């Protein structure tokens, strides 16, 4: 289904051409003065120079052609040369009827679907998820869902941090605590136990203890580095411990991501890319891409157009050790080999931009990816507390994600119990649903690249630009529809009608923009545009709700029109919140 702006533009292009002017001047936009009109065209102002004519004369010529169009109810030429447009109520109602009959609600699925690997999440194993992991998970999940909604094949990969010194530290500390474990017996050749030698709680305590000791005890650090080296070079017992670390961590991570309604198609980690590193290093050397500089192996990635210095991409340190660059490039090779994606999209902290510029340029220069494979970096800003500094616990520590979710759910529960007489058990369930909307909408309503303040009071409010306000609006619609059926009404033979008043038309105009908003949000990887849209849509619905008596309307046709409009508004809002990554309760 074509976007409504396209259909309006086609009509205006035709009028410009019939009036003897070029089509490229016929650009139509949403009106920036909705009190005067709904859409506008300022092309006459630009055309005046070309045609050596006063803009208002050109505007009048175009308007003369447009008055014959059935799309518009009102067309005006306004000084100095604006063309103001108002849509016909009949045309708008017909457009929404077609939209309501379309199973995709007017969304045109991609004609040439792309396969896109989405790298988001990125937690380290053996450590609990904390608030710093929130943005990548929420933004990545939303873009994955949006891509699928638009018809693309989206593959989400958590890309675990499961390699490097942290593993050696855990092995060393475990060896000190439980030296008799078979994993440390080099003569042992049997099967290793299926039961892990630690719980997630023990694992989360082992790592910080080991990390702290390594900073004070040089011999301990040396032992950890040696254990890391042995693990990376195939030590059988250490590989067995790594498997347990992954099993225990991933089980816990899945549980925590589930609370956020975030899921991944792939649970791969840095360790999965390791087998690709030796051949990649050899290839980069053999083909002259990599050279030795001060003992390290590097690839030059400067470009003539650079406005700031981009250092070479280091592949191996002078001691032969690999780095994040090495692992990320090997992961790109693995992804190209196994999945052949059209695009790999990284949802990562914006402070890592230089790292990804280096990796992407190296991958392109060394032909590790096809020429037309797109490598995209979506950098996000920091989630801060009210003091403008990164969000912390009250005593200044890093807040665990599960504690943040608990805190938000408690606040939502308190507000629900305060405002309504309701069953405590049901209120708890509702608080979880609404709490998730508070967290996700609070994050996604900000442009991804911007830092933002996580304000618990504001995000959990039922008023203003918040998740709970959006859900409250959806529940209000559901309750009207439920009441209609309880009173013996039917929702089967309803149909959108020509609008009767300004608030109804405003709601219909907002609904008609749904497909354009979703398409634009995907093109720009901008979930915040969906948030802005549904906030406007919720406001338009609530104005309509307060002005119109829906269920007590005596004119049966009008009432059916209102109910059809409610059904479409509910469906559009629910489609949007699904893409944003949360759901609505039945009652609030």
Predicted regions mapped to residue ranges:
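Non-catalytic interaction-recognition regions
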Residues: 1-93, 107-588
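A short, compositionally biased domain-edge/stem linker segment
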Residues: 101-106
């Amino acid at each position: 289904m074509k976007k409504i702006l396209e259909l309006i533009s086609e009509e205006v292009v035709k009028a410009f051409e019939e009036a003897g002017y070029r089509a490229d001047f016929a650009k139509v936009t949403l009106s920036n003065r909705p009190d005067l009109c709904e859409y506008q065209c300022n092309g006459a102002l630009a055309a005046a120079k070309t045609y050596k004519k006063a803009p208002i004369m050109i505007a009048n010529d175009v308007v003369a052609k447009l008055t014959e169009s059935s799309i518009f109810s009102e067309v005006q030429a306004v000084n100095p040369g604006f063309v103001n447009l108002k849509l016909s109520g009949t045309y708008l109602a017909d457009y929404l009827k077609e939209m309501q009959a379309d199973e995709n609600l007017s969304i045109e699925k991609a004609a040439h679907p792309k396969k896109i690997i989405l790298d988001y999440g990125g937690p380290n194993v053996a450590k609990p998820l904390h608030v710093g992991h929130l943005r990548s998970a929420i933004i990545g999940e939303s873009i994955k869902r949006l891509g699928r909604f638009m018809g693309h094949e989206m593959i989400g990969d958590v890309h675990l941090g499961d390699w490097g010194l942290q593993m050696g530290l855990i092995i060393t500390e475990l060896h000190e605590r439980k030296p008799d474990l078979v994993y440390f017996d080099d003569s042992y050749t049997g099967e290793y136990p299926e039961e892990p030698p630690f719980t997630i709680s023990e694992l989360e305590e082992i790592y910080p203890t080991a990390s702290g000791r390594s900073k004070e005890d040089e011999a301990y650090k040396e032992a950890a580095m040696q254990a890391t080296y042995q693990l990376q070079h195939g030590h059988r017992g250490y590989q067995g411990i790594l498997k347990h670390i992954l099993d225990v961590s991933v089980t816990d991570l899945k549980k925590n991501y589930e609370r956020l309604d975030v899921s991944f198609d792939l649970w791969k980690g840095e360790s999965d890319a390791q087998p690709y590193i030796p051949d990649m290093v050899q290839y980069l050397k053999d083909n002259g891409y990599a050279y030795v500089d001060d003992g390290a192996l590097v690839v030059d990635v400067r470009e003539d157009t650079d406005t700031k210095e981009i250092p070479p991409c280091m592949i191996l340190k002078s001691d032969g050790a690999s780095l994040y660059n090495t692992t990320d490039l090997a992961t790109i090779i693995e992804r190209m080999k196994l999945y052949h994606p059209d695009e790999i999209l990284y949802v990562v902290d914006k402070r890592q931009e230089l790292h990804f510029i280096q990796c992407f340029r190296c991958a392109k220069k060394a032909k590790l990816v096809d020429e037309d494979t797109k490598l995209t970096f979506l950098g996000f800003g920091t989630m801060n507390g009210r003091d403008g500094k990164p969000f912390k616990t009250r005593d200044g520590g890093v807040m665990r994600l599960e504690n943040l979710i608990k805190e938000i759910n408690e606040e939502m529960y308190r507000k629900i119990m305060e405002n309504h007489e309701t069953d405590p058990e049901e209120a708890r369930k509702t608080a979880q649903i609404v709490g998730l909307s508070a967290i996700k909408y609070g994050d996604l309503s900000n442009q991804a690249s911007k830092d933002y303040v996580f304000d618990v009071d504001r995000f959990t409010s039922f008023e203003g630009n918040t998740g709970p306000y959006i859900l409250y609006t959806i529940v209000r619609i559901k309750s009207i529809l439920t009441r209609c059926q309880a009173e013996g009404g039917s929702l089967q033979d309803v149909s959108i009608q020509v609008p009767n008043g300004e608030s109804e038309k405003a709601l219909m105009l907002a609904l008609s923009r749904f497909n354009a908003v979703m398409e634009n949000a995907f093109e720009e990887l901008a979930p915040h545009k969906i948030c802005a849209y549904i906030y406007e849509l919720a406001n338009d619905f609530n104005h309509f709700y307060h002005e119109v008596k829906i269920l007590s309307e005596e004119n049966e046709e009008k009432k059916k029109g209102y109910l059809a409009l409610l059904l479409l508004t509910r469906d559009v809002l629910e489609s949007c919140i699904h893409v944003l990554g949360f759901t609505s309760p039945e009652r609030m």
